[in-house]
């Protein structure tokens, strides 16, 4: 708890009294939303005591605090992953820091592979539920300051916000889909056999992030909204020796950043 308080205090001292309402986690290749934040304060992760540093492709490693759609937001321009060697405790740290800074909502985004054959590259999918194949970030002593020992995840992703997002998508003529996100450790992409298995158990999108952040956010009582950008279609035929590439994932995500920015901005305006 001391590390969380120390990190939060370090950030708070640089905010000039601002209190963010919304925390935003920007996934691979999706960091450009931070460029749309007005009157920004940039806080590099490497200047925050006890904070990890992003090493993944497409993750710049900054907190950006400022105004978006008339609301004060704090955006993570880059997240942390289990495959980088960080503990679940460190993956939970940024969410808890943002909670101490005052956020009430957490918006998460990621670049994901499609297990659902109806999804195609550059589709934007609203996350309605998830399947966790990672260690749970709440294992260990419970931090009562944040929440109960056994939090309920029946409604991990806020239904009211999801409905607003679908209405906005319809208004803006976006072909938004909904799906279940499956989180595995990475850093390897899935084998064709794994893809077939994950699809059988109900997965629509496959990725290596997001779920630990959502679990911690719900433990903290935050309302959560999530979006996956489809950047690759999972290989189930095993016909090609090389099928997935991290640089291509980032490039594909970058092509749809504008669409995601519009959705997030309109949603935040309505909070």
Predicted regions and their residues:
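Metabolite-binding pocket within alpha/beta catalytic cores that recognizes anionic/polar moieties
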Residues: 1-153
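Short acidic/polar active-site loop segments enriched in Thr and Asp
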Residues: 104, 204, 223
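Active-site/ligand-binding-proximal alpha/beta "capping" segment
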Residues: 167-204, 264, 271
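Zn-dependent metallopeptidase/amidohydrolase metal-coordination segment
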Residues: 208-247
């Amino acid at each position: 708890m001391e590390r969380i308080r120390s990190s939060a205090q370090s950030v708070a001292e640089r905010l000039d009294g601002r209190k963010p309402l919304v925390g935003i986690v920007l996934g691979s290749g999706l960091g450009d939303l931070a460029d749309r934040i007005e009157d920004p304060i940039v806080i590099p992760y490497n200047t925050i005591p006890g904070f990890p540093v992003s090493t993944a492709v497409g993750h710049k490693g900054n907190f950006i605090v400022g105004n978006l759609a008339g609301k004060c937001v704090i955006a993570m321009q880059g997240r942390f992953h289990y495959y980088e060697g960080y503990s679940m405790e460190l993956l939970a740290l940024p969410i808890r820091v943002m909670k101490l800074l005052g956020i009430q909502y957490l918006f998460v985004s990621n670049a994901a592979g499609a297990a659902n054959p109806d999804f195609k590259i550059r589709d934007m999918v609203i996350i309605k539920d998830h399947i966790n194949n990672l260690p749970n970030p709440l294992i260990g002593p419970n931090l009562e300051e944040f929440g109960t020992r056994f939090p309920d995840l029946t409604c991990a992703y806020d239904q009211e916000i999801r409905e607003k997002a679908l209405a906005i998508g319809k208004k803006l003529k976006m072909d938004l889909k909904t799906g279940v996100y499956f989180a595995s450790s990475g850093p390897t992409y899935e084998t064709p056999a794994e893809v077939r298995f994950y699809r059988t158990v109900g997965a629509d999108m496959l990725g290596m992030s997001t779920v630990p952040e959502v679990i911690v956010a719900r433990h903290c009582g935050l309302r959560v909204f999530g979006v996956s950008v489809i950047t690759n279609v999972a290989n189930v035929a095993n016909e090609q020796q090389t099928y997935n590439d991290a640089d291509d994932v980032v490039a594909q995500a970058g092509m749809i950043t504008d669409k995601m920015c519009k959705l997030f901005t309109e949603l935040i305006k309505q909070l």
